[in-house]
């Protein structure tokens, strides 16, 4: 806190597999310097991943938009990015969204393709 450094907790595995666990950690620490990173592909084990996004959204300062061009390396999800972006925007999200490309396709083609798809989803979410 003295240095103005924000610590962001990512939903990944173990303790941060669920939105409820992430919120429990953030609220227990109870510091304005601890917030969340939303990895859009990592609420895979939640019963309703969009409900999980809705639950954690007020705590999110950064989001990873995970894409899977050419099929995923470990798994592939068909994510509704516009729906996720809308949830974030409706809760006042003003942070950054980064691309996390995990597909088999060559990054030379996959990254521009993913960016175009995400930009379109962002526009749709703002309508």
Predicted features by range, described:
Residues 16-127:
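Histidine-acidic metal/acid-base catalytic patches
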Residues 1-3:
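An active-site-proximal structural segment forming one wall of the substrate-binding cleft
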Residues 7-11, 37-39:
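Short catalytic-loop micro-motif centered on adjacent basic/acidic residues
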